[in-house]
Amino acid sequence: TTSRLSVYLRCLNALHAAGIKTISSQALAEQFNLNSAQIRKDLGYFGEFGVRGVGYYVEDLRDHITKILGLDSPHRVGIIGAGRLGTALANYNGFGRSNFTVVALFDNDRQKIGHRIGDAKLLVHDVDDVARVIREEAIDVMVIAVPAKAAQRVLNQVMSVGIKAVLNFAPVSLTARRGVKVKTVDLTTSLESLSYFLSQPQSSAITEPLSQSRSKENFPQRRKGAKAESF
């Protein structure tokens, strides 16, 4: 449900920017290729937001969903892994629109530690200093962008100092303790799903319903004997 709320919020932001004041669930569904019944069910779980004969007040609903998702308060983000992916994530300016600010990068490469990289000129810290920097920078969300073999160890490190929200880009499923949420971004499985679709006879342009578009957290492992890489 929370993933769909994020999509609704993006849609409502677009409507608000366009100056639209009210919208029905049906119109919202048609305009953004959503499911009107699912919209009503999801929103009904959190309260009564619609007005009979009017629909939803765009600005009010946007503000409610922002609070439900906890986006009315700022979040400070650290990224472990200052390679191409980690640097690209640090440079992404879309996080700020959702009240996330990347404040620190970490790596184990001595040639990167102590240098400032990316558009924001973020200092790359030694990953061994992650506990101290998390406390000093008041980081509450960590992003893991390291090779698969290092990911669980890195997760254990950040969990040990109280981090409860982790976005994982490493190609491996991770084990988290109770009370810690790990969200894995699985690009390979999504591409494999598209490959399956293309391989079927009479494939047509079908967009999966939002509620069915989640994928499992599995990546192929690095082949045996592959060279270890720093992060």
Predicted regions and their residues:
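Conserved mixed alpha/beta catalytic, RNA-binding, or beta-rich assembly cores of soluble enzyme
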Residues: 92, 99, 116-127
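Glycine-rich adenosine-cofactor-binding loop
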Residues: 70-112
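Short beta->alpha connector loops
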Residues: 83, 147-151, 224
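Short, low-complexity, charge-dense intrinsically disordered segments
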Residues: 205-213, 220-229
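HTH-adjacent hinge/linker in prokaryotic transcriptional regulators
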Residues: 22, 26, 31-76
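Phosphate-bearing ligand-interacting subdomains
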Residues: 11-16, 120-201
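Extreme N-terminal segment that seeds HTH/winged-HTH DNA-binding domains in transcriptional regulators
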Residues: 1-21
